[in-house]
Amino acid sequence: MKFISPKTDFAFKKIFGSIHSQNILISFLNAIVYNNQNIIQSLEIINPYNPGVTNTIKETYLDVKAVLDNGSTVIIEMQVLNVEDFEKRVIYNLAKAYGNQLDVGQGYMMLTPFVALTIADFVLFENTDKMITKFRFKEETELFNYQDELTLMFVELPKFKKELSVLETLSDKWIYFISSAPNLEVIPSSLEEVSEIESALNIANMANLSNEELEELEQQEKLIRDKKGQISLARKEGIEIGREEGIGIGREEGMRILVKRQIRRKFGEVPPEVQTQIEQLSLEKLDILGDEIFDLAIIADLENWLANNG
């Protein structure tokens, strides 16, 4: 078996936002939003995925939207690249979605709570090791909530370090699925025992995709590669500008600093031995690593790269 990565816009919508994905999405949201509690019993997926619709990266910045049985709405985004002003965009999209609930003449009592769940393939909050973080309006000193109407939640995939053999909770298994599905060759028994994850893996099985869907997936992956290339080029140009302006950092040291920063943003803090290996890389190897880091899914991939290129 070969599984597609759930991190692409196409795959995420197909797995979690299709018309038949209700049970998959219920299990996922109960695990992530409600801390492995069976809170959600039913939901309605708004504007479910249809093949052939996704043409560009993040036309709407909103992968999946669902109304829960408690009246709340969850908007879910899978974000692969840490683009400029990303954090502000998340706030803007949540506030805009909340305000757009009302039609002309409707009163504020018609407003219902909104949750923005963002799954990031990079590190957002370097000051904490928490993988799942939740933000609400709180009083500054006594920290009591002001109207639980707006919630921001983030899942930082690079902070997830667990191997398949030590997965415990439902959230562990869902995050492992999102992080590592392309590395699987069969459906592991520990994931298969969760029927919704088994269903998600069957959807992600490349053999079950139509030619139209395979073409759409290829287009998405190409767009992501192109975007990564643009970011890599901008990084290189930044180094050259810094060198020409005489910042006082040699090209190799400047490249090393940038690569280490990229690694920290993607994987969080790395073991000392990995840091030592990075310190020993030549300028040429640092340049290559800077280009290829976006394709390394987990810390083990980075360790393997260093072992082969050190």
Task: Name these PLM-found stretches.
Residues 1-310:
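Elongated, amphipathic alpha-helical interaction scaffolds
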